[in-house]
Amino acid sequence: MATNATVPAAMPRVGPPLWLGLPLGVFFAAFVLVPMLLLVYVSLHDDSGLTQFGIAQYLKFLGDGFNLGVLGSTMWLGLEVTLLSLLTGFPLAYLYTQAPGRWQGPLMLLIVLPLLTSSVVRTFAWVVILGRQGIVNTALQDLGLIAEPLKLLYTPGSVAVALAQIELPLMVLPLITALMNIDANLRQASLALGAGHWRTFWRITLPLSMPGLLAGSLLVFASSVSAFVTQTLVGGGQHIFMPYYMYQQAIQSGNYPFAAAIAMLLLVCVLAVVVAVNALGRRSKGIVHA
């Protein structure tokens, strides 16, 4: 005797209602989209009175060698800070993933501690450390290594070092996530086959940690090129970068259209770097050398 079995229809998956995202959309529009559109609007004026539309501000910036030099110095600073953060952050992230569980908590506290303090406080700490009467110069003079204080502050190098320390958590945290997602069996298999620790690192660990490396690099680069406080206090205004240049044009000169154009050009350059790094990440995704 044949029996007919009735298979219940699958219940449609019901996601959260769209209105739950409304507060986030309003926040994004009010504090990101609208200010960005206003910035574009102001930059597209040829005069400070905002009466004549045009692209004269962009042509003025791109046609001046000094302006292009400021842009190039800012991009180079971002690259230096990113490399310094990577060279110090990768060993720290690797140390965290290899540390026993009881040590990971204190290590994580040390990593995120800079994020719990104001950037102004951290920057002033570097001013105290690198000043002519600062900790470094005082220690070197007490040891008899130098006769006169070294000029450590108000240099591009001091700005890069200070920013690398301040932005370090932005590099370390994505690297920790990427390193912890690597299957430990891959390293063990590589070592068992006689690859050695260095070869295993270069062939297995580094390629598989590339997503975290690229994410951290983008965060550090984007944050460092726009770090007005650190660039100004540690640099002393003697070396002009794009954020301080915007401040000069807007506050000191009252040339808001030109300042807005500077901001938009910096944004375009940062977005170009983001697109290029994302393209590199897609090409290198999943590549592990044999």
Predicted regions and their residues:
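Glycine-rich helix-loop "coupling/hinge" segments at transmembrane-helix boundaries
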Residues: 47-53, 228-254, 290
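The alpha-helix within a helix-turn-helix
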Residues: 190
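Short cytosolic juxtamembrane segments of multi-pass membrane proteins
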Residues: 4, 280-290
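A short amphipathic helical element positioned immediately N-terminal to and/or at the very start
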Residues: 53-62
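Glycine/proline-centered hinge or cleavage motifs at structural transition points of membrane proteins
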Residues: 193-195, 207
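Short, Lys/Arg-rich, polar N-terminal cytosolic tail immediately upstream
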Residues: 1-14
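Short glycine/proline-centered loop/turn elements that form peptide/ligand docking sites
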Residues: 182-186
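Membrane-water interface segments at the C-terminal ends of transmembrane alpha-helices
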Residues: 13-48, 61-180, 204-228, 235, ...
